[in-house]
Amino acid sequence: EGVLMSLFSLPSKFVSFFILVFLLALFSGCSTTKNEKNYSASQLLRQSKKLSKNDESEKAKTKIQQLMEDYPDSKERVAGSMLLADIHFKEEEYEEAKFHYQKFTELYPAHQFVDRAHFYKAMSNFKLTDLASRDLTPVNSALEGFQRFIEDFPKSSYLKPAKEKITQCLDILAQNIFEIGKFYYRTGSYQAAILRLKRLKVEYPNHSYILEAEFLLGESYYREQNFPEATAYYKSVIKNSPRSEFAKEARLRLKAMR
């Protein structure tokens, strides 16, 4: 009441000025709110697509969030959900991308593009693979995702790239076993090397490192003075690749053991 009385005690030109400022602020706020709400779901989706295309990812995410909040039951929300996951994937935010692709598969399991969400969820795991790390959780998760994908979506347009990624995942896992076995061999832990390299032969018999693995098995047994086993692996190397450098070395070992 005191403020109101103070206002009326001011000269009329000041009162008019304050009223004018108040009304301008009021209408400006209403106008902004009105403009924000004036965008339809389809407009918000188009805007977010354009922003994403122009590499304005954060603004695109904001538009999608507005779409989700203002139009929770719209058909555009479905496309917005996929677009949000795609933006995270494009920005190499693979944990976030994986989360949103998973969410899409849960919310829209019968959608015509649900196979795409499953594929890119597995791709997100694949992208999280750090070849320099010993943590193989992401590549194992990716492998599982791609294998399940080809079972669930045998007619998908993503079938071929999914199979290619399975091969890459298997290569990474095989290479990991091989490198560990090779490390044990180099450090003189021959029994540990033998265990790893034998596991490689059993689990990945057609891998590109198999020939070298067989040679290192022969070398490991040779250094353990288990000459019968060493001989068997050297002969296998010569038989499988007679002109290779490993075969050349194997022949020298066999000659030395006579």
At which residue positions do the language-model features occur?
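Sec-dependent bacterial lipoprotein signal peptides
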Residues: E1-C30
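Acidic, polar-rich low-complexity tracts and alpha-helical solenoid repeat scaffolds
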Residues: L7-S9, L26-R258
